[in-house]
Amino acid sequence: MSPCENDTPINWKRNLIVAWLGCFLTGAAFSLVMPFLPLYVEQLGVTGHSALNMWSGIVFSITFLFSAIASPFWGGLADRKGRKIMLLRSALGMGIVMVLMGLAQNIWQFLILRALLGLLGGFVPNANALIATQVPRNKSGWALGTLSTGGVSGALLGPMAGGLLADSYGLRPVFFITASVLILCFFVTLFCIREKFQPVSKKEMLHMREVVTSLKNPKLVLSLFVTTLIIQVATGSIAPILTLYVRELAGNVSNVAFISGMIASVPGVAALLSAPRLGKLGDRIGPEKILITALIFSVLLLIPMSYVQTPLQLGILRFLLGAADGALLPAVQTLLVYNSSNQIAGRIFSYNQSFRDIGNVTGPLMGAAISANYGFRAVFLVTAGVVLFNAVYSWNSLRRRRIPQISN
């Protein structure tokens, strides 16, 4: 038992702050290595333009693929053993893997370690499950929206810090620094997260069929998983072509990398500002209204992105899109809280994470395929169509049910 754990009532607000810090540290740790990932692949012996592109794409995607496979297993274990121990397992496991990545000698070792990183991940979905089971239901939207800003903040600062560290100390030391950040996350979680959890034996665990029957609305929960997948597909589809699209818009300028970095970052800044506020609004008017409105707003912003003429126009639209995106996943997570019990929260949030990871893999592939065949601008129009389908699909699923009465 950690020093923070005793018989006093759990202070969920303090747990939220500590979980936010943990999500921030893991978000930063994951994104620290992203700016130089292709350079590290090249340093490990991969040469040639096409081979470098292929291997960079594979080592990037394989983490999400294995995370999607492993998430349900870890979610089930969290429902049996508790969420805090899963947070500790994830932070420590990822820290050890990061050290090994810094010691990798060839691309195959690095590929296996990237897959292992995905297998051992799961800090964020378990943090979501922990907070969702402790926070009063009528504050779920605000709490989960606030928690989501932790990972976003870390992901925003990580690439900048990673690039500076790589330039100053070289590529391999950044992996060791990243491991140190994750070990720090482990100790913060160990000493400052409190959870009162009664372990459940394997025989007492609900099986998959029982999990489904225990849900208040199984079809709605499945539709929310699909919504999460499509949100990530839409977000990821733009990532592979953004820098090239900015270069096309900017023309012959010397600082295209800086401009691209700014435009890539502004949605995260907007989401950071909007997520807690829209989450709080969702607690008042209903997360389903926030979800549908944000999806429609996203469609209305994606379409003109296909017709912009300057990087500034694209940047403004991306900022507004980020404000809408900041409401989407917290709204989905709040609806999952409303429609499932604490007994299965670990598995529900882990299933949702699996769908999110699948979206992270398929989104960039879709964007790259569309841009290769139809040009950069077509990506935004197709993505708008995908999000519009998501809005109609979500509205159709949500209108068939009423949110249960919420109480403290």
Curated annotation (Swiss-Prot):
MF-aspect GO terms: transmembrane transporter activity
Protein name (database record): Multidrug resistance protein MdtG
Transmembrane segments: 16-36, 58-78, 92-112, 115-135, 146-166, 173-193, 224-244, 256-276, 290-310, 319-339, 378-398
GO cellular component, one term: plasma membrane
NCBIfam families cross-referenced by the UniProt entry: PRK09874.1
Biological source species: Escherichia coli O6:H1 (strain CFT073 / ATCC 700928 / UPEC)
Membrane topology: Multi-pass membrane protein
Keywords: Antibiotic resistance, Cell inner membrane, Cell membrane, Membrane, Transmembrane, Transmembrane helix, Transport
A Pfam family hit: MFS_1
Function in brief: Confers resistance to fosfomycin and deoxycholate.
Keyword Cytoplasm listed: no
HAMAP family registered for this protein in UniProt: MFS_MdtG (MF_01528)
Record-stated family: Belongs to the major facilitator superfamily. DHA1 family. MdtG (TC 2.A.1.2.20) subfamily.
Lineage: Bacteria, Pseudomonadati, Pseudomonadota, Gammaproteobacteria, Enterobacterales
Main location: membrane
Transmembrane in keyword set: yes
Subcellular location, record wording: Cell inner membrane
PANTHER family, per the entry: MULTIDRUG RESISTANCE PROTEIN MDTG
GO BP field: response to antibiotic
